[in-house]
A protein has these predicted regions:
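Short, loop-centered acidic/histidine patches that primarily coordinate divalent metals
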Residues: 73-75, 100, 112, 136
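Short, conserved charged micro-motifs
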Residues: 77-83, 142
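Short, acidic/charged, Gly/Pro-enriched secondary-structure junctions
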Residues: 81-108
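Hydrophobic lipid-interacting interfaces of membrane-associated proteins
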Residues: 134-141
């Protein structure tokens, strides 16, 4: 039987950050987020499962695509800096996303680009400026061993 008194831990929302390796002027820390902070979502499979006559053969991929979304406080200049970057060059490069968990390591994404801009509310009831990126996340490192 498991211990019912296992410590649950705590999240720290001000840990969340987006660090842009080659464009540090775009780095985002807690004070620059709007109401929401950030999300990361895998797209597609980390491994293919290829049918055979009598079963299936796994075929691990060396990378997985991810969507990275975060919401900036649009009343701060950093939101305009991200908009300027989108207008100038949609290629961002590598980014590091620090999570809200003190025990979960950061996620490092390669070759990130802008996906799109979600709806921006302009009626004075939301301060969120949405940023959507797509990047490559290395998985299955054992393939290279």
């Amino acid at each position: 039987m498991t211990n019912p008194l296992t410590p649950i831990g705590a999240l720290n929302r001000i840990l969340t950050a987006v660090q842009v390796v080659n464009l540090p002027q775009l780095n985002v820390t807690a004070g620059f987020f709007g109401v929401r902070a950030a999300t990361i979502s895998p797209e597609g499979e980390a491994s293919d499962y290829i049918p055979t006559m009598t079963g299936a053969a796994p075929s691990p991929r060396p990378y997985q695509m991810y969507s990275i979304r975060f919401w900036l406080n649009k009343s701060q200049a950093l939101a305009q800096a991200w908009e300027n970057q989108r207008q100038q060059n949609t290629t961002i490069g590598d980014i590091n996303v620090v999570t809200d968990s003190p025990v979960l390591g950061p996620y490092y994404f390669i070759n990130c680009t802008f996906l799109n801009v979600e709806e921006i509310n302009l009626d004075g009831t939301s301060n969120d400026y949405p940023v959507m990126l797509r990047g490559t996340y290395p998985v299955n490192a054992a393939l290279f061993a």
